[in-house]
Curated annotation (Swiss-Prot):
Coiled-coil annotated spans: none
Top-level taxon of origin: Bacteria
Site positions per UniProt: May be catalytically important: 154
Gene this chain is encoded by: folE2
Protein name stated in the entry: GTP cyclohydrolase FolE2
Membrane-spanning residues: none
Organism (species): Azoarcus sp. (strain BH72)
Length: 269
């Protein structure tokens, strides 16, 4: 009995490419998958992450095998965690016969916060990205990116005004290359402590009074926030390299204020 699968199907991807040009990254982008992430309190958060998965393609291959990325992500019906991140990446590089690989996993992470006066609790969400890379020679590198919403209040506005000062919500983003485990909560707490005031999911009137006055008593330019955060990141031994950036969504302008500091401690060592 003849079957369509009885005859060999050509593997076009494995055929030789005459242009002889290597590709740095090729793969799949924006695929969602359930993940689990351990929190600092000993619990596990179940969430959904957006994945980008790439490998380097040698100059002599026409294409990569796109279906294998999906197979790796879904293998054993497992949920991806930070603990399984490196093994998954190494499996991807091996199965696709590549020397380099890159996986990004972006997901919402929730922290239960208590309001500063009433103590009422509510969830705050933070955008987190885990990035793993396999470099030539097999070296693994892990980077964590956390976007932290905060409040900033303008020192100049406070100084020149008879009363009040303009303030706004800001996003402070820390991207850190790690040499050891660092909790998401630690990064959030570090950033929030350097803002004019924290942002909360739920506030009662006494809390609203507190955060308004707290921001007024603690004005920060966008430059101040990135410098203050960078000063603490410089002391964190679990971080090899970092970028800290702040975008202030100005309340009196139709544009944002922005600042960025980057440092690689490994180069300076």
């Amino acid at each position: 009995m003849n079957s369509p699968l009885a005859h060999a199907i050509p593997d076009v991807q494995n055929s030789e490419d005459s242009r002889q040009i290597a590709i740095n990254k090729v793969g799949i982008k924006s695929i969602r998958h359930p993940v689990k992430v351990s929190d600092k309190n000993g619990g596990v958060q179940h969430t959904v992450a957006n994945f980008n998965m790439y490998v380097g393609l040698p100059h002599n291959f026409k294409g990569t095998h796109m279906s294998r990325f999906i197979e790796i992500l879904n293998s054993n019906e497992r949920e991806i965690s930070v603990e399984s991140f490196e093994p998954m990446l190494r499996e991807m590089v091996k199965r696709l016969e590549a020397e380099t690989g890159h996986v990004e996993m972006t997901f919402p992470y929730f922290i239960n916060k208590s309001a500063p006066v009433s103590g009422v609790q509510s969830l705050m969400d933070y955008e987190v990205t885990f990035t793993g890379e396999i470099h030539e020679g097999g070296r693994y590198e892990f980077t964590m990116k956390v976007v932290v919403p905060v409040t900033s209040l303008c020192p100049c506005s406070k100084k020149i005004s008879a009363y009040g000062a303009h303030n706004q919500r800001s996003h402070v983003t820390v991207t850190a290359t790690l040499n050891d485990h660092l909790w998401i909560e630690d990064v959030v707490q570090l950033v929030e402590g350097q803002a004019s005031c924290e942002v909360y999911g739920l506030l009662k009137r006494p809390d609203e009074k507190y955060v308004t006055e707290r921001a007024y008593d603690n004005p920060k330019f966008v430059e101040d926030m990135v410098r203050d955060v960078a000063g603490l990141l410089n002391k964190e031994v679990r971080i090899d390299a970092y970028a800290v950036e702040s975008e202030n969504f100005e309340s009196i302008h139709n544009h944002s204020a922005y600042a960025l500091i980057e440092r690689d401690k490994r180069i300076e060592a």
